[in-house]
């Protein structure tokens, strides 16, 4: 993973979304704007969500494309949206949405690092208290290693 996975340009603190769909679109749009994925990757994120929910627990959802969507991934990357107001994710409250695009099997490494971080409730609380994209990048920066 030579390219940066996460940058302040793909992090939004105090993000707003009225629905799960708006949140997925926002996460996907950040990946497109940064050049990580082709625009139709966002459609594949929605397709994945219809197959299985990307809600993981602890206020976290990790929308990502289907297996077929790998063709639309230019570089592995991640977008992070932190919401003050919870987003209804099929009846679950989500406050952090992490959009993921992985080249080859790199998404598995990214997912593993995120899962470890979010398995600790105090880490989730800390992330929710951060005020800037720079602070979020410092907190989640290990995904770039």
Swiss-Prot record:
Domain PTS EIIA type-2 span(s) in chain numbering: 4-143
Tree of life domain: Bacteria
Keywords tagged on the record: Cytoplasm, Kinase, Phosphoprotein, Phosphotransferase system, Sugar transport, Transferase, Transport
Signal sequence bounds: none
Active-site residue numbers: 64 (tele-phosphohistidine intermediate)
InterPro entries the record matches: PTrfase/Anion_transptr, PTS_EIIA_type-2_dom, Sugar_PTS
Post-translational modification Phosphohistidine, affected residues: 64
Subcellular location: Cytoplasm
Gene Ontology biological process: phosphoenolpyruvate-dependent sugar phosphotransferase system
SUPFAM superfamilies with a match to the protein in the record: Phoshotransferase/anion transport protein (SSF55804)
Free-text comment on this protein's domains from its UniProt entry: The PTS EIIA type-2 domain is phosphorylated by phospho-HPr on a histidyl residue. Then, it transfers the phosphoryl group to the PTS EIIB type-2 domain.
Function, as annotated: The phosphoenolpyruvate-dependent sugar phosphotransferase system (sugar PTS), a major carbohydrate active transport system, catalyzes the phosphorylation of incoming sugar substrates concomitantly with their translocation across the cell membrane. The enzyme II CmtAB PTS system is involved in D-mannitol transport.
Name the UniProt record assigns to this protein: Mannitol-specific phosphotransferase enzyme IIA component
Originating organism: Halalkalibacterium halodurans (strain ATCC BAA-125 / DSM 18197 / FERM 7344 / JCM 9153 / C-125) (Bacillus halodurans)
Source lineage: Bacteria, Bacillati, Bacillota, Bacilli, Bacillales
Gene name linked to the record: mtlF
């Amino acid at each position: 993973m030579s390219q940066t996975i996460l940058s302040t340009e793909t992090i939004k603190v105090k993000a707003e979304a009225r629905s799960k769909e708006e949140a997925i679109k926002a996460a996907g749009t950040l990946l497109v704007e940064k050049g990580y994925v082709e625009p139709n990757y966002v459609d594949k994120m929605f397709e994945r969500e219809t197959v299985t929910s990307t809600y993981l627990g602890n206020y976290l959802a990790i929308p990502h494309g289907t297996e077929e969507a790998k063709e639309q991934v230019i570089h592995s990357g991640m977008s992070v949206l932190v919401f003050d107001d919870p987003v209804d994710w099929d009846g679950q409250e989500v406050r952090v949405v992490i959009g993921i695009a992985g080249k080859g099997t790199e998404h598995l490494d990214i997912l593993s690092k995120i899962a470890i971080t979010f398995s600790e409730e105090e880490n989730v609380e800390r992330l929710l208290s951060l005020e800037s994209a720079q602070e979020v990048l410092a907190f989640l920066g290990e995904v770039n290693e």
